[in-house]
Amino acid sequence: MKFLILDVYPSNDWRLVKDTAGGYGTGNDFGNSLFSQTVNKFVSKMISMPPMYAIYIYTILKQKGFVVEYERDLNNRKAIDEADYIIMPSSIIAHESEVKVLKDLSKRNKKIFVVGVFSSVLKNNYKEKNSYIVPGEPEGFFLNLTYSTQNLDSFFEGEKNELNPSNFVEDLDALPFPDWNYYSKKYPLKNNFLGFNSKIAIPILASRGCPYSCFNYCTYPLQQGRKVRLRSVKNVVDEINHCMQAMDTNKFVFRDPVFSINRKFTVEL
């Protein structure tokens, strides 16, 4: 069984990051002049990362023994054609491009799991004959999924397609450490400016969820829920040590929306 995580972007020439803004994504396009295009290209290489859940999904599927790839190149027809199931991250910044590719894949009878909070907000845009919109945190969905062809195919049938279960991961320690080593060999994994400290920058989450009242307009509670869930300090430290040994970097970017909400936890970490 082969899975392809197909991460669609309208351009590689300026910074587009789907993980920011609570999974909606953000981008910087400084203009069309020669200078602006140079800045666009530079920034796109200096600040670059995928949606974290995409690499969690990759790692979960890999550990379960499946053939899985992460790909941004739509010209890689071989990977697309050979995939039994395609997993497509969604975002506001690449919405039009994602939907266009989704429609094309559905017409070719490819089965597509659409992941990410934005597809749950704009369901009608991502709803196709051969698509299933995964609600909640997709890591929970793929961690607990029954991997038989019969069960997987059932998600693309009418009745099951309308199910809307919660997939929030209560025990964050149950998640594997994302395989950033695989990703960084194919694409930039950076978070620096003006070339300072250009080591690989590992995104990491010590907690998920945000309880504050700004949930009325903020995207993070949509993505992670309002309940704050903490990993154990040991689990976070073990991931840091794992990445330092596997990737020879000591640069980490904590992506928690409320990293310091629990002072005791933060100080211990």
Residue ranges and their predicted role:
Residues 3-29:
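Short, solvent-exposed beta-strand-terminating loops
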Residues 6-8, 88-89, 115, 255:
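Short hydrophobic segments within beta-strands
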Residues 177-269:
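Radical SAM [4Fe-4S] cluster-binding motif and immediate context
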Residues 53-171:
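Glycine-rich beta-alpha loop elements in corrinoid/cobalamin-binding modules
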Residues 15-16, 151-203:
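N-terminal [4Fe-4S]-dependent radical SAM core
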